[in-house]
């Protein structure tokens, strides 16, 4: 899977992420880091380059990105969690199964 589009919105203290793959399938994820939405936006911008590479395993991607960045803060974990949710949402939609 390759991510072709990354969108995000800050709603109060929540970051909502929508990732779209090369086939046009999109997935949603959310993360929360108190009221520091701008911090999560900056982190997502940093991770965008990594998300442009093919994704073979959501678990591998999460661990790879978590280890790559030394500032392992709650904000990083919130953004990675939102990305992880969105990727699993895409994978579930591709095989027409619910994501629970």
Give the location of each predicted region:
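Structured beta-strand/loop patches that form or line metal/cofactor-binding pockets in enzymes
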Residues: 1-28, 32
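Metal- or metallocofactor-binding catalytic centers and their adjacent structured scaffolds
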Residues: 20-98
């Amino acid at each position: 899977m390759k991510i072709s589009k990354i969108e995000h919105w800050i709603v109060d203290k929540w970051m909502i992420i929508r990732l779209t793959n090369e086939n046009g399938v999109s997935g949603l994820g959310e993360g929360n880091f108190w009221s520091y939405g701008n911090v999560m936006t900056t982190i997502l911008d940093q991770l965008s380059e990594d998300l442009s590479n093919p994704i073979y395993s959501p678990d591998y991607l999460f661990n790879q990105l978590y280890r790559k960045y030394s500032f392992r803060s709650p904000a990083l974990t919130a953004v990675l969690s939102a990305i992880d949710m969105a990727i699993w949402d895409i994978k579930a939609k591709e095989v027409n199964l619910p994501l629970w």
